[in-house]
Amino acid sequence: MDWVLRRFLLGSVTAKVLHDISCPVLTGVHLEQPPHHLPLSFANITCAVDLDCHSQETLTWAAQFASDLHAQLNLVHAIPALEPGFEIPFGGDWKSDVANLARSDLEKLVAATGSDVSGIYVQAGESRKTVCSFAKSSGADLLIIGRGSQDGIPGNLPTNAYAIIRESPCPVISVSA
């Protein structure tokens, strides 16, 4: 049965590894030219969460990893760039309300995990663009994202996560939760 599923997996060896195993996976940045030097440490780490049921495990792992490396940890979350439809009445500053609600949920997540984070950032936009843009602008040395299991398949990586790994300006560790 596994061979049937595998044959429908498109992409690289990386995609197959991310799909098949449940341990954290470090993926590098796709570069046309090799770098002149490789970073010897990860001092500025960003953890991106989507506030799903796996966010707590992802943040806990990221916080422990950052602590072990004596690194700064930032938490980022992308909210959809919602635009009101014709039939949906939005009042007041609803965009701020959505961002504040997400920030509140992130603060609760940080408190629940006891994580030490340097900053919590909520930005509107498409997940892959927002997360990768934040990683670049904040000078992140490493990005940590969650890799949940869907339909009982360990290691399954949502579409946004594949795009984040592919487009990240820095190495990415995807954590199976």
Where are these regions (language model features)?
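Short acidic active-site motifs
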Residues: 13, 105, 127-132, 160
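Short, surface-exposed alpha-helical segments at coil->helix boundaries
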Residues: 96-107
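Small/aliphatic-rich secondary-structure junction motif
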Residues: 40-92, 96, 115, 119, ...
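Structural beta-alpha unit
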Residues: 1-2, 111-143, 148-153, 170
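Short beta-strand elements of ligand-binding domains
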Residues: 24-30, 146, 173-176
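Short, structured interface segments
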Residues: 14-34
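Glycine-rich, Arg-bearing micro-motifs that act as flexible, cationic patches
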Residues: 1-16, 142-167
